[in-house]
Amino acid sequence: MSQKTYLSMIARENMENMQYKIVNVHDANGIKLRVAAGAGVLGVLDNKPKSGENATVVVAGLTRCFAGATITAGSFITVTASGTATAVASGQYMLGKAITGCASGSHFQLLIQHNGYRG
């Protein structure tokens, strides 16, 4: 059985079409879609909130994630500018590890570990 750690935040933009995308802290208790490729992030959005509604964010454990490129099982994952996942490159933040692989535009299983920046 996989355990997840969730945070309850407030969506600071309409996120109805952003479920399973990668998000980050925007302001006090608020989140927005991640906009800086390879930068540090908070976690993966687990629901579909409108602006001002409760947003559930998975910050640790196994979750679904939306791929912005082909993902290979076992690869470390970072974020694209559009909040999707891609394989990490040197100097980028490693959100976690892909447990399954998939094609771009599909969902895969991501183990969120917050591994820091890749050297």
Annotate the PLM regions.
Residues M1-G119:
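Surface-exposed, low-hydrophobicity beta-strand/loop segments enriched in small/polar/acidic residues
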